[in-house]
Each structure stands twice: as C-alpha cells, then as structure tokens.
UniProtKB/Swiss-Prot annotation:
Provenance organism: Staphylococcus aureus (strain N315)
GO biological process: phosphorelay signal transduction system
PTM statement from Swiss-Prot or TrEMBL: Phosphorylated by HptS.
Protein name according to UniProt: Transcriptional regulatory protein HptR
Ranges in a coiled coil: none
GO MF entry, a single one: sequence-specific DNA binding
C-alpha cells in the first residue's frame, strides 16, 4: 500500500533496515534503497513515497540538501544521524521532519514511529476515500463505517486489506467460519450489493486517489487489483460513466 525510500551511504545500514524491519506489518509493500541523496531524489520524484528515511552525511548530496529538494513534496521524513551531527540536525528542524534516530538504529524505536505514522496515513486515506465517495453515487454503499452483522464487517475489512491483490470471494471469507453461499447472501442483504460489486467499487474508489499522482493508467489498474487494464477501464466506465482519461480531464 505505502512506499518508503531508505537512503544511507553505508550498505549494511540501508540493507539492514530493508531486511530486518517487518515493513508489511506497517502496510509498506515497496521498499527502495539509495546510497546517496542524488539516487534518493530520483527515486522520490519517480515513485512519490509516503516515507523517506535518510542519513545526514552522505557523498554527492547530503541529507539536508535532499530535504531542501523535497520540501514541497508530500512525504514524511525520518533522519538518521550520529552524535556529532547536531548542526546538521538543527538544519533539518525547519523541514518539520517526522523524527530523528541515532545510529546504530534502534529497530524497536523505529517500529514505534512506523506504527504512529501508519495510523495517520490510514486515517488520511480513509478521510480522502470518504470525501471522494460522497461525491459519486456509485460509491454510496461504501460510506457506511460499520454494519450490524459480524460477518459482513469482517468481509468489508478483508476487502479493504486485500483489494490490491487478485483476490476472490473464497479468499475474502476463508478466515470466517461460514459457507460461501451464506456469506454472499448475508452480505447482499445488509449492504445491498454483492461482495464482488463492493470489491470492484472499492478498487475504483481507491484508483481515484492515484489518478493525480502521475502514474500511468495501466499501473493504477495493477495497484488496485485488476489483472488487466481493460477490466479496470470497464469498471471505471461502469461506475463513473466516463473513462479514466476523461475523468482526469474533467478534474483539471
């Protein structure tokens, strides 16, 4: 769901953070690494990560220069520093970085920071989704936060966690102790649409948040769980009565 760029000129540090931290537990499924600020800036501009973890002292472009370059971008920054980097750290304060970590990095402390960050990111995503949903009739069934049926709530939660994958109804209900026919009937009774319909509407809703982030449309299709672009385009037109390209033109 989220992306992170890890920048440090010491390979053992950047690869250690990539391998040791259970990123998936914090909804980060794409991890990029860079050995200096120049590489990091290129990755950040190309992939627009939600989080950047960067060392301060690096060759070619140091961490403070990198912060200056990405000051206007919507990403969170964690600075890695040594005890003698205080002057560099002060320079970073003006950029409102998320946090500072001393080397060697305390992985438990980093995970605490990630936990706080992901709660904020998920809440922002939820608010953005509700705002978009309220503007389109097709997404009205997605606005309800909770249903009065345990199994329905479990399925909705599973959809929100799994929509980016090629998930099936069987996959969505495998963790609840009911038959597929019962789950499908109960879901339709409470929500008013089928499980598959809800899943596809949710995927299209999430795609709207990606359309203004410079992704190619086939990339968006893949990111929200459609196996091929033509299926994404079909469902987009089905729910919004226009193509993704027309939607982008209208939004400008």
């Amino acid at each position: 769901m989220f992306k992170v760029v890890i920048c440090d000129d010491e390979r053992i540090i950047r690869e250690g953070l990539k391998q040791i931290i259970p990123w998936g537990d914090y909804h980060f499924n794409t991890i990029y690494t860079a050995k200096d600020g120049v590489e990091a800036l290129s990755l950040i501009q190309q992939h627009q990560p939600e989080l950047v973890i960067t060392d301060i002292r690096m060759p070619r472009k140091n961490g403070v220069d990198l912060l200056n370059d990405i000051a206007l971008l919507d990403c969170n920054v964690i600075i890695l520093s040594s005890y003698d980097d205080f002057e560099y750290m002060k320079a970073g304060i003006q950029h409102h970085v998320l946090d500072y970590l001393l080397k060697p990095v305390d992985h438990a402390q980093l995970e605490v920071i990630l936990g706080r960050l992901v709660r904020t990111l998920l809440e922002q995503q939820s608010q953005n989704g509700r705002s978009l949903a309220s503007c389109h009739d097709a997404f009205q069934p997605l606005l309800k936060v909770e249903y009065d049926d345990y199994y329905v709530n479990q399925i909705v939660d599973q959809i929100k966690q799994s929509y980016q994958t090629k998930v099936t109804v069987s996959d969505l209900i495998q963790h609840i102790d009911v038959s597929e026919s019962y789950a499908m009937r109960t879901f339709k009774d409470h929500v008013g649409i089928t499980i598959v319909d809800y899943l596809n509407r949710y995927r299209i809703l999430q795609s709207l948040q990606l359309l203004d982030r410079h992704y190619k449309h086939y990339e968006i299709a893949d990111k929200v769980g459609f196996s091929e672009y033509k299926m994404f385009s079909y469902h987009f037109k089905k729910y919004l009565q226009m193509s993704p390209s027309d939607y982008c033109k209208q939004a400008k």
